[in-house]
Amino acid sequence: MEPAVERKVPEQEEQLQPSHARAEDAPPAAVEEEDEAEAEESERRNRELKAGLHPLRRKLVLWYTRRTPGTRSQSYEDNIKKIVDFSTVESFWVCYCHLARPSSLPSPTDLHLFKEGVRPLWEDPANRNGGKWIIRFKKAVSGRFWEDLVLVLVGDQLDYSDDVCGIVLSCRFNEDILSVWNRNASDHQAVMTLRDSIKRHLKLPHTYLMEYKPHDASLRDNSSYRNTWLRG
């Protein structure tokens, strides 16, 4: 089966540079905040284990965006609606079994599955220094790959998973687009390792074309999927 929309893309130089910044280089207040959040997550998992449930490593939130074509009266942020959150395997399946499949969603529509505390906005503090890997699919096969990507995120299976903020399904008129958002667009090793991990978990060919775009570039050109920087 051919999963992708075939696209001819000119070669570009890789514009990401390796970064040596790590958690230990963060300001003390930021480190303290991360430690508190991790402690809260640990307490939550312990409570759920005692209740006989199967806790996820991170609580996740599902968001929905639907903009009526030709309507510009509302901002993108105003159009984002929270659907549900879940933190256990059991609550995930209850939610997922009732969700509409990509093939039944109108265009343009976006579904966002993000870690709790991170909003699916370029400007969110967790996202503003990051970017996203972009994967384009024919509409006939996108549902399968979206489900696989959801299960990968829920299972915390991606490499550099702490660097991953969330995933997005964008239903468009001629194609569907999946994207994986990460925190640090300047960490070349993390960005490229994440790309390889996505391909491996989705069983995409090694030569399959993916695109990367930093969120600050999206802010400049006000576009999610045009003018991507890195292809590979």
Swiss-Prot record:
A family per Pfam: IF4E
Keywords of this entry: Initiation factor, Protein biosynthesis, RNA-binding, Translation regulation
Show the ranges annotated as biased composition (Basic and acidic residues).
1-11
PROSITE patterns for this protein? IF4E
Write down the InterPro entries for this protein, in alphabetical order: TIF_eIF4e-like, TIF_eIF_4E, TIF_eIF_4E_CS
A Gene Ontology CC term for this entry? Answer: eukaryotic translation initiation factor 4F complex
Q: What family does this belong to?
A: Belongs to the eukaryotic initiation factor 4E family.
Say what the protein does. Recognizes and binds the 7-methylguanosine-containing mRNA cap during an early step in the initiation of protein synthesis and facilitates ribosome binding by inducing the unwinding of the mRNAs secondary structures.
Complex formation: EIF4F is a multi-subunit complex, the composition of which varies with external and internal environmental conditions. It is composed of at least EIF4A, EIF4E and EIF4G. EIF4E is also known to interact with other partners. In higher plants two isoforms of EIF4F have been identified, named isoform EIF4F and isoform EIF(iso)4F. Isoform EIF4F has subunits p220 and p26, whereas isoform EIF(iso)4F has subunits p82 and p28.
Indicate what this protein is called per its UniProt record: Eukaryotic translation initiation factor NCBP
**Source organism per UniProt:** Triticum aestivum (Wheat)
